[in-house]
């Protein structure tokens, strides 16, 4: 295949495209960078994890376990909060490498704040999900698979965001190493138009089911309740406190 001639219209277009910014970059600044290789991921802290998101008649309920592991062989932390508020009425879970997930959350939170300060209104949850998918696809956030939940004028929303940037909305979803165990419970217990109180019990039972058999999940449950009034997050090492 012949190379384009120097200074031809085509070569100048190629040079211009090479200098264009990444379409997935944030509005201000640039995407966080790292030089991790795939092999390095075997030796970083990971959340392992089971995370659950349920859309309800009142809003959204998110539940996660509390365990982080090192290399999948050692429990490095027993009290990890794996769900963080990133929007006045929205929250995101940490799934995968801890550093990548934390950087992902910080980047999204900054974009949400910037949007509100520039436009004088809150970003919709659907727009936030699209932004999260773009960041996951175009950024350096290795091995993340979070759940985004939130409430806006259109109602309550739950999305799973895969490592390639795929965004899927559903009534309920589960991600992480214990997802198969938790899904078994949710398939039986989920009902349409549940209240947040009912969904808390269903989600906590789902996390408990995963903790029983999944070595990457354990040590308790964090529960996040989202309504149009805000986000409330609380943790429990003893499942009996919420079941």
Curated annotation (Swiss-Prot):
It comes from the Archaea. One of its GO terms (cellular component) is proteasome core complex, beta-subunit complex. Residues 1-34 are annotated as: Disordered. GO terms for molecular function: threonine-type endopeptidase activity. One of its GO terms (biological process) is proteasomal protein catabolic process. Pfam families: Proteasome. It catalyses: Cleavage of peptide bonds with very broad specificity. Residues 1-14 have a biased composition (Polar residues). The active site is at residue 49. Transmembrane segments: none annotated. Residues 1-48 form a propeptide. Keywords: Autocatalytic cleavage, Cytoplasm, Hydrolase, Protease, Proteasome, Threonine protease, Zymogen. The formation of the proteasomal ATPase PAN-20S proteasome complex, via the docking of the C-termini of PAN into the intersubunit pockets in the alpha-rings, triggers opening of the gate for substrate entry. Interconversion between the open-gate and close-gate conformations leads to a dynamic regulation of the 20S proteasome proteolysis activity. Its EC number is 3.4.25.1. InterPro entries: Ntn_hydrolases_N, Pept_T1A_Psome_bsu_arc, Pept_T1A_subB, Proteasome_sua/b, Proteasome_suB-type. It is found in: Cytoplasm. Belongs to the peptidase T1B family. The 20S proteasome core is composed of 14 alpha and 14 beta subunits that assemble into four stacked heptameric rings, resulting in a barrel-shaped structure. The two inner rings, each composed of seven catalytic beta subunits, are sandwiched by two outer rings, each composed of seven alpha subunits. The catalytic chamber with the active sites is on the inside of the barrel. Has a gated structure, the ends of the cylinder being occluded by the N-termini of the alpha-subunits. Is capped at one or both ends by the proteasome regulatory ATPase, PAN. Component of the proteasome core, a large protease complex with broad specificity involved in protein degradation. This is Proteasome subunit beta 1. It comes from Haloterrigena turkmenica (strain ATCC 51198 / DSM 5511 / JCM 9101 / NCIMB 13204 / VKM B-1734 / 4k). The lineage of its organism: Archaea, Methanobacteriati, Methanobacteriota, Stenosarchaea group, Halobacteria.
């Amino acid at each position: 295949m012949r190379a384009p001639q120097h200074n031809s219209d085509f070569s100048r277009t190629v040079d211009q495209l090479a200098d264009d910014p990444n379409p997935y970059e944030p509005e201000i600044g640039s995407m966080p960078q790292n030089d991790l290789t795939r092999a390095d991921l075997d030796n970083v802290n990971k959340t392992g994890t089971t995370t659950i998101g349920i859309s309800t008649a009142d809003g959204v309920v998110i539940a996660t376990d509390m365990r982080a592991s090192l290399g999948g062989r050692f429990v490095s932390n027993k009290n990890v909060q794996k769900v963080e508020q990133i929007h006045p009425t929205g929250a995101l879970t940490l799934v995968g490498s801890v550093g990548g997930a934390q950087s992902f959350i910080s980047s999204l939170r900054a974009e949400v704040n910037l949007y509100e300060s520039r436009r004088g209104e809150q970003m919709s949850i659907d727009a936030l999900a699209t932004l999260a998918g773009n960041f996951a696809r175009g950024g350096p956030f290795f091995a993340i698979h979070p759940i985004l939940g939130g409430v806006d004028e259109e109602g309550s929303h739950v999305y799973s965001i895969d490592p390639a940037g795929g965004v899927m909305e559903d009534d309920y979803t589960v991600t992480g190493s214990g997802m198969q165990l938790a899904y078994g419970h949710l398939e039986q217990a989920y009902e349409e138009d549940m209240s947040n109180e009912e969904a808390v019990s269903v989600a906590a039972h789902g996390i408990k089911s995963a903790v029983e058999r999944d070595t990457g999940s354990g040590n308790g449950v964090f529960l996040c309740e989202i309504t149009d009034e805000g986000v409330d997050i609380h943790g429990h090492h003893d499942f009996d406190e919420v079941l």
